Amino acid sequence: GRSNSLVVPWFSCQTMITPWQLEGYRVHRLPVGHNFQLDADALANALAACRRQGEHPAVLTCETFGIQPSSKLIEVLKQARRDGVPVIVDRTHSFLAPSRTPADIEVVSTRKLLPLTEVAWVQADEDLSELVGTRDNKDVFLTSARRRFLKDRGLDTFEEAENLADDCWVPVPPDDDARAEFEGFNLAEFSRRVDQTRAALLSGLEVAQI
């Protein structure tokens, strides 16, 4: 039957969980390992417990900081899918690189990684277009507020955008200008700079350990 509960890592973004709660899903938060990924044994045990209690769980796993799952977690996720448990992966931190996570659905919010007002997506095997609403004044105001925040980063502009976002839970197409900005963004160069920063950070850590 339709899923009615969600298994998530403790270390995850609440904005990815709230929509499920608004749909009435019961949320089970599980511990993560040293790599911030779901603990594989805890996940397997939680899924078994959900089934014993008559729940129909789904799994939301997150590639936090771009970290990929361990081979053990990959096997647990594969088994979950074989058992008919939907697996959703939050690739907000990792969409610039390939993913090892076996999943049915991919969700990404680009503005958490890129200096853009919006553009997010849900990628799935089935057609989800009927779930997309129509932009209205609330969405226009939110886009404008996010632009003001990007130009003038402060608590006031941040709170203005976040307060408007609280009233905009229905997915709608992105603003045309925001879409054009994303399509024109040099993702390859940005990815190169991320790798460069990562290498510099790791090098600094090695020096600090000596």
Positions of predicted regions on the chain:
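A generic structural signal for well-ordered alpha-helical segments
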Residues: 20, 78-81, 205
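PLP-dependent aminotransferase class I/II
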Residues: 60, 129-210
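Conserved PLP-anchoring active-site segment centered on the Schiff-base-forming lysine
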Residues: 1-50
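Active-site phosphate-binding strand-loop segment of PLP-dependent enzymes
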Residues: 36-130
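Residues within well-ordered alpha-helices
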Residues: 16-18, 76, 201
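Pyridoxal 5′-phosphate
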Residues: 25, 55-56, 173
